Structures are given as structure tokens and as C-alpha cells.
A protein has these predicted regions:
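Bacterial N-terminal signal peptides
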Residues: 2-10
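Hydrophobic alpha-helical segments
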Residues: 5, 14, 53, 89-90, ...
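Short glycine/proline- and aromatic-enriched beta-strand/turn motifs that initiate or cap beta-hairpins
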Residues: 13-61, 159
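Residues that define the transmembrane beta-barrel architecture of outer-membrane proteins
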Residues: 21-23, 36-40, 68-72, 86, ...
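Glycine-centered flexibility sites
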Residues: 26, 30, 41, 93-95, ...
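Extracellular loop and loop/strand-boundary signature of outer-membrane beta-barrel proteins
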Residues: 28-29, 60-63, 106-111, 140-142
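Gram-negative (and chloroplast) outer-membrane scaffold detector with strong preference
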Residues: 45-107, 116, 127-133, 157-160
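A generic hydrophobic-segment detector
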Residues: 115-160
Length: 160
């Protein structure tokens, strides 16, 4: 009996795993812990091999403490499906961030922009809500010289 249950779960996971290799376009919202900023962005899942996908994304970090940011990421996910409609994934990739800060000095507003490249590392959890919708939560750490940053985000994607 145990063997039949195991085979059923394995085949359900295999059938659903094919659904993980579809393109997806979505929106996300997140929080950057070190700078206490809220983010919003768009992402795309582009599969290139079984359970592998490239994930480009663009995020805007809203101003907090007179600091805002644009971020472009290129990550790779390896999906590990389980229980039919769920998967976990490690992620790794690159980041480009452009931070802008404003300050007032002698009644003049000064602004400073810093552009940095970095490396992303993290993990995520994804759930297929329906045939065309998925939901994910993801945590990553961005290694950038003098500006390392922890980030958590949630996203909703449309699969096509």
C-alpha cells in the first residue's frame, strides 16, 4: 500500500512539475531590512531547462529617510517541486542598484546617486494557485560592496 501511495505522489509531482516550466509575468512587493524601505516590482520567469529558469526583475524602492532606489536583477532559480502544486527553490544571480539620497544643507537641497553591482543569494517558496496563477515568497541577501542588504518579497504571477 505504501508503495502505491509513494508512486501516486511521485506521478502527481511529475505531472505538475511540467507546469513549472512555463513562462510567467508578475508583480511583487517587498521589504529591505537594512534601509527599512518598501519595494514594488515586476518579474518574469523564463524557463530554459527542466526545473531551471532565468528570472529578470525590476524593482523600485520607495523613499524612506530620503533614500530611494531602482534595482535590476537577473537571477536563476532551480525548482524543487513537491506535493503537486508547491515548489521550493534556491536562487543566485546579479543585481544592479541605483540609490538616490537627498539632504538639505544651508537651505539647498543636495542629491547624491550611487550605482552598485552585486550578487544575490537566497531561496523561495512557490505555490500554483491555479493553472494560470502562482504565488511566491522569497528571501534573498544582496552582497554589494559597503551596502549589503537583506530582502523579503511576495509575488503574484500569471503563467502563459
Amino acid at each position: 500500500i505504501g508503495l502505491f501511495i509513494f508512486m501516486g505522489l511521485l506521478s502527481a509531482t511529475t505531472v505538475r512539475a511540467q507546469n513549472y516550466n512555463t513562462k510567467c509575468l508578475g508583480i511583487s512587493a517587498g521589504y529591505m531590512f537594512d534601509t527599512e524601505n518598501v519595494q514594488a516590482g515586476v518579474f518574469m520567469h523564463l524557463p530554459f531547462a527542466k526545473n531551471w529558469r532565468v528570472v529578470p526583475s525590476v524593482n523600485y524602492t520607495f523613499s524612506h529617510h530620503d533614500l530611494n532606489e531602482w534595482e535590476i536583477n537577473g537571477n536563476i532559480h532551480y525548482l524543487i517541486p513537491f506535493a503537486g502544486r508547491f515548489s521550493v527553490y534556491p536562487l543566485a544571480g546579479i543585481a544592479f542598484q541605483s540609490w538616490r539620497g537627498n539632504a538639505l544643507q544651508n537651505d539647498k537641497e543636495l542629491s547624491n546617486t550611487r550605482n552598485k553591482f552585486g550578487i544575490n543569494a537566497g531561496a523561495g517558496f512557490e505555490m500554483n494557485i491555479s493553472r494560470h496563477l502562482n504565488l511566491h515568497i522569497e528571501g534573498k541577501y544582496i552582497f554589494i560592496n559597503d551596502f549589503n542588504q537583506a530582502n523579503i518579497s511576495i509575488g503574484l504571477g500569471y503563467k502563459f
